[in-house]
């Protein structure tokens, strides 16, 4: 069984989530929310890859893979006249606290297991302005 994908932290949700050529086909590419965040941090903010990875709470390698996939999708849309729809992915907006369903421990790191009892039953804790992990979420 493959490892579950951890939620990537994003700090920005765009005002508009659909962009299309003035004239064009009905084809579109789906840009995940975390892919847009990678482009924003690296290309717009001009941060170093290490800083981007830290902000998104992923490894440098994972950040690089997210960024490459995002750039491919944007290039495909621009070169081939496709629309871009921004939605979905595995992300948490802002900071999130996690709760172990086994022992009740609350912690801030996005981990596959509880640091206290090592249970894999860990969920994003909703409460007081904390984020919620969106997994393959349509729209926002």
From Swiss-Prot:
<dbReference type="InterPro" id="IPR036388">
    <property type="entry name" value="WH-like_DNA-bd_sf"/>
</dbReference>
<protein>
    <recommendedName>
        <fullName>UPF0251 protein Athe_2281</fullName>
    </recommendedName>
</protein>
<dbReference type="InterPro" id="IPR013324">
    <property type="entry name" value="RNA_pol_sigma_r3/r4-like"/>
</dbReference>
<dbReference type="Pfam" id="PF02001">
    <property type="entry name" value="DUF134"/>
</dbReference>
<comment type="similarity">
    <text>Belongs to the UPF0251 family.</text>
</comment>
<dbReference type="InterPro" id="IPR002852">
    <property type="entry name" value="UPF0251"/>
</dbReference>
């Amino acid at each position: 069984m493959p490892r579950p994908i951890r939620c990537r932290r994003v700090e920005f949700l765009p005002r508009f989530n659909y962009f299309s050529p003035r004239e064009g086909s009905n084809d579109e590419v789906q840009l995940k929310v975390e892919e847009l965040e990678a482009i924003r941090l690296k290309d717009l903010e001009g941060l170093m890859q290490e800083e981007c990875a830290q902000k998104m709470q992923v490894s440098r390698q994972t950040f690089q893979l997210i960024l490459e996939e995002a750039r491919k999708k944007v290039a495909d849309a621009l070169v081939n006249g496709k629309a871009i729809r921004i939605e979905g992915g595995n992300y948490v907006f802002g900071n999130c606290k996690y709760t172990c369903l086994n022992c009740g421990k609350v912690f801030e790191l996005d981990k596959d297991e509880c640091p206290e009892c090592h249970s894999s039953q860990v969920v994003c804790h909703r409460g007081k302005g904390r984020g919620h992990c969106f997994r393959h979420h349509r729209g926002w």
